[in-house]
């Protein structure tokens, strides 16, 4: 079903079965597959390809040569009906690629809302990107990566498969991330190592002075105390009982499979 208010350029191809919401815009030379859903007000600028079982929300801006929902690059993939879901108000810039999931990884690649994916960023199969994240130019997520809310990944940075990038993290450009990055941390290098707490970012997001002190204390326990990881986890858990901001660390430890960067 295509709403009557949708603009479709004469050179675009929208296949039968596609669902496009009110006031969407399908620009020149775009291709929209038969299983695609596009929400109200979303704009495909030009030369955008969206195919597979892909659902895109409202008011997104998708720029030329982006490819969304294409067959993933996992050699085990055998054409199973896997999906891509994208939320609302994202800006997906030129030549971004977002691949469909695999059955081994849950079958879904998911991007939340209010994100900025800059030129040539890549989101591989089974990745989850939260809300209000930034992937700078040429940032690359391998399969099964999780990027939590408000994270920023610098240009030319590559993230190893199955890694977690915690909430409010900033990863510097040209880095190689091979382990999980705890929330609030600045990471840089190849392999990426911790360089302190993302204090300026947290201030901009309204964290209290007390909360910032607690986060710094958790960081010091993890990286500067000389304690083993297990010892640091126990003390951080105690700190989290008094300071809710620190709970992000304990939740991160529960999810982490590759271990935190050191």
Curated annotation (Swiss-Prot):
SUPFAM superfamilies reported for this sequence: Trimeric LpxA-like enzymes
UniProt KW keywords: Acyltransferase, Cytoplasm, Lipid A biosynthesis, Lipid biosynthesis, Lipid metabolism, Repeat, Transferase
EC number(s) reported in the record: 2.3.1.129
Compartments (UniProt record): Cytoplasm
GO biological process assignments: lipid A biosynthetic process
Gene Ontology cellular-component terms listed: cytoplasm; membrane
Cited function: Involved in the biosynthesis of lipid A, a phosphorylated glycolipid that anchors the lipopolysaccharide to the outer membrane of the cell.
Protein name: Acyl-[acyl-carrier-protein]--UDP-N-acetylglucosamine O-acyltransferase
Organism: Salmonella typhi
Species classification: Bacteria, Pseudomonadati, Pseudomonadota, Gammaproteobacteria, Enterobacterales
């Amino acid at each position: 079903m295509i709403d009557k208010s949708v603009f479709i350029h004469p050179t675009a191809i929208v296949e039968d079965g596609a669902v496009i919401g009110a006031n969407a815009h399908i620009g020149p030379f775009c291709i929209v597959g038969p299983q695609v859903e596009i929400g109200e007000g979303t704009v495909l600028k030009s030369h955008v390809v969206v195919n597979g079982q892909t659902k895109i929300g409202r008011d997104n801006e998708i720029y030329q040569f982006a490819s969304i929902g294409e067959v993933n690059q996992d050699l085990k993939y055998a054409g199973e009906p896997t999906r891509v879901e994208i939320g609302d108000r994202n800006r997906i810039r030129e030549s971004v690629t977002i691949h469909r999931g695999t059955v081994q990884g849950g079958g879904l690649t998911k991007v939340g809302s209010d994100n900025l994916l800059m030129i040539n960023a890549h989101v591989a199969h089974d990745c989850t990107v939260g809300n209000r994240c930034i992937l700078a130019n040429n940032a690359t997520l391998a399969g099964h990566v999780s990027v939590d809310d408000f994270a920023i990944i610098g240009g030319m940075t590559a993230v190893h498969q199955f890694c977690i990038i915690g909430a409010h993290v900033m990863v510097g450009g040209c880095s190689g991330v091979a382990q999980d990055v705890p929330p609030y941390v600045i990471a840089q290098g190849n392999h990426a190592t911790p360089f302190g707490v993302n204090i300026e970012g947290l201030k901009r997001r309204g964290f209290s002075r007390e909360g910032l002190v607690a986060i710094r204390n958790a960081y010091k326990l993890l990286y500067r105390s000389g304690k083993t990881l297990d010892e640091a986890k126990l003390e951080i858990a105690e700190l989290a009982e008094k300071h809710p901001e620190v709970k992000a660390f304990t939740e991160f430890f529960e999810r982490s499979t590759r271990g935190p960067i050191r």
